[in-house]
Each structure stands twice: as C-alpha cells, then as structure tokens.
Amino acid sequence: KKKAIWIHNDIQIKIKEEFKYRILHFFFKDKYDYFDTYCAVSQGALDSFKEINKNKNKDKCYLVIPNYIDTKEIADKLKEKSDIKVDKEKVNIVTVGRLCHQKGIDIMLDNIKQLSNVRKDFHLYIIGDGDEKEKLIEQMKRLDLEQYVTFLGNQKNPFKYLKEMDLFYLSSRYEGQGMVILEAKSVGLDVLIPKHLEKYCPPIKGVDDVLLYLKKYKKSNKTKKFDDLNDYNNNIRKELNNLFDASNDK
C-alpha cells in the first residue's frame, strides 16, 4: 500500500524562526523519503514543503487537501449564551488563537494603537492563551489600550463570543491553514487577513493595507447568516476518497 503524510504548517518559516523545530527537522527530514504522497492543508504550506525538498522526491505525488470543518459542532456551540456584554454601537473585532510569536498578536496591537488615534468606536477581543500572554498584556498597557482591548483567555466554546462580533481579524506571521478564518466566516462574520496570508486561507482574499481597512470598516446591520460550508467540505471528502482509493492500489 502507498503511504501519505500531512503537512500542517509552513515548514520553511518554522525552520527559520523556531530553534526546536529546526533541530527536529534536522533529525527527521529523511523520514519523508518513506512516503509516496505529500498532502498539505494549503497551497502555502505545500509550496514551502516543496521548496525545502526541491532537490529530491520529485517523482512523488503532491496534493493540497484542506482540513475538514465540523460546522454541525459549530452550530451546536452557537446555541450557548454569551456571558459577556458587548457594545453593539461599536465595531466589535475578535481574534482566536494561541498567544505566541507565530500568531502576530503583537502586530495586531500595534495596528490597534494606530487605529485608536483616528477612531474610538471599536473594541478588540482576544480569545486564547499561550507563552506570550503576559508580554502581550504588558504591550497593551504600554500602548494605553486597556479601554480598547479585552483578553478573554482560553475558551472551550469561542463561538458563543464570535456570534456577538462584527469582524474577525487574523494577523499571523504565517499559517498552515487559517481554519479559524473559515470558522468565523461560517458564523457570518466579516473577515480580515493581510495579503501574505492568502495562500494559507483560500478562498479568503487578503488586503494590502490592514490599517486602512480598519479605518474605513463599517459594521453591517444585516442579520448574520450561518454558512454550513457544504461545498467546501464536500470537496474535501472527494479529495480524501480519491487519495484513499489511490493509496490502496498496489
């Protein structure tokens, strides 16, 4: 039987930015030779992997198969009542993710500081925990953003908060696949990503100037419409079935 391996991140950037990952890759990189098919969760992750392995494994199969998103579970979690009160007169911005260097929350806070100089009708909610939490809270205080930013910590059900928001903002330095963007889209939120994240978050289009987008953004008065991502998930099922059928060929 043929063997497949999944690529879940931008390996090229992780090697560059994370010492521990650099060591792991050095010791385990030859293991890739034992696989017949390389599946990446986004084109960005695949391009990065192919660049790292450009001088070998040219006869192998390379595929992009994104992660499946369980929208039924999301729909169930949306039924839970939020335990925070947001100001509906303001633009409520949210982000969800680990508070680590990769996710670029420090970049987000710098942009929020600049935004606060030109408009006051917004609030940012940060959902997640991680090694950089205290550092980011200190940055928030140093930038005098306490009235504009709330850290909600790690939440088992972030969707009960997402349904109260207007705009989801992802500021990662790099991704594997920006699943959280599609999850936010399924809830009915507008989504914002910088241009360099497009290759990790199809079909979402990124913007060249994030700050300009935030300055001009106007919240919609339309009722949020839930998207079950049916076409997206069906395409993944087809790709997986094709992969499994091919893997069972002798």
Show the residue positions of the predicted features:
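Acidic anion/phosphate-binding donor-loop and adjacent secondary structure
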Residues: I15-K16, K50, L63-E89
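Membrane-proximal helix-turn-helix segments that form the acceptor-binding/catalytic region
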Residues: K20-C39
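A short, active-site helix/loop in glycosyltransferases that binds the activated sugar's phosphate group
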Residues: F35-C61
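A conserved mid-protein helix/loop that constitutes part of the nucleotide-sugar donor-binding site
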Residues: V91-Q114, D131-I137, M179
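Nucleotide-activated donor-binding/catalytic signature segment of Leloir-type glycosyltransferases, i.e.
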Residues: I137-G153
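Aromatic "clamp/platform" in nucleotide-sugar-dependent glycosyltransferases that forms part
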Residues: N154, R173
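Short hydrophobic beta-strand element within catalytic cores of glycosyltransferases
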Residues: I181, D190-P194
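A charged, aromatic-enriched C-terminal amphipathic alpha-helix characteristic of glycosyltransferases
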Residues: K219-K250
